[in-house]
């Protein structure tokens, strides 16, 4: 992991890991941590160093948004316009602008969340999101199918990467902030980086396997 290319940032997935494990990674220089449970992330935010950049990487429920808006650096999993609008509403109340990634469904499993490419195109073309002044769409996120088939993983990541280029050219050509492509986890981040990822979400390779 120390060999990461310059443009790739590491999100250390610290969910279910104790503060001590995060502090150890922090002392080693890691500053970006990813959590998928609102309550857990908020508790950690309150008790850990304030220069940590907290990324929310789970499935976000609309009624929980208000708890993370004051401090979250990036929300990776925006999978509906409704969710985006609610983040905007809560961010406006908090006097903040929240960075968000649109989550695309690229895997074969039905269990994964996200827009289809067509749904995402429709939402962006409709243009209502331009009225939301308290969110900033900074890029896209996706999860590949959990499989040992490297070719399939590569194909899924490449499809998201080319969709990113399409979206950037069509709707965010002048937006410098639209530059993040969050894809790749412990088992497939090499393929993700090769396909153009700028954010990899890695847990077990840093913290070891979790004890549930």
Predicted regions and their residues:
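Divalent-metal-activated hydrolytic enzyme cores
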Residues: 198-199
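Short C-terminal tail/terminal secondary-structure segment
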Residues: 202-212
């Amino acid at each position: 992991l120390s060999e990461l290319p310059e443009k790739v940032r590491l999100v250390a997935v610290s969910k279910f890991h104790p503060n001590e494990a995060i502090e150890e990674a922090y002392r080693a220089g890691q500053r970006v941590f990813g959590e998928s449970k609102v309550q857990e992330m908020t508790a950690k935010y309150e008790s850990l160093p304030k220069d940590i950049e907290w990324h929310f990487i789970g499935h976000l429920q609309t009624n929980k948004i208000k708890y993370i808006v004051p401090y979250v650096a990036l929300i990776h999993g925006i999978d509906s316009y409704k969710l985006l609008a609610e983040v905007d509403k809560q961010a406006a109340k908090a006097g903040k602008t929240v960075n968000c990634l649109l989550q695309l469904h690229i895997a074969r499993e039905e269990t994964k969340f996200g827009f289809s490419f067509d749904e995402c195109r429709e939402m962006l073309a409709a243009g209502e999101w331009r009225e939301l002044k308290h969110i900033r769409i900074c890029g896209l996120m996706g999860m590949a199918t959990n499989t040992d088939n490297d070719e399939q993983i590569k194909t899924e990541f490449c499809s998201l990467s080319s969709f990113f280029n399409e979206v950037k050219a069509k709707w965010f050509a002048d937006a410098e902030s639209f530059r993040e492509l969050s894809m790749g986890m412990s088992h497939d981040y090499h393929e993700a980086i090769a396909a153009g990822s700028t954010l990899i979400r890695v847990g077990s390779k840093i913290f070891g396997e979790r004890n549930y």
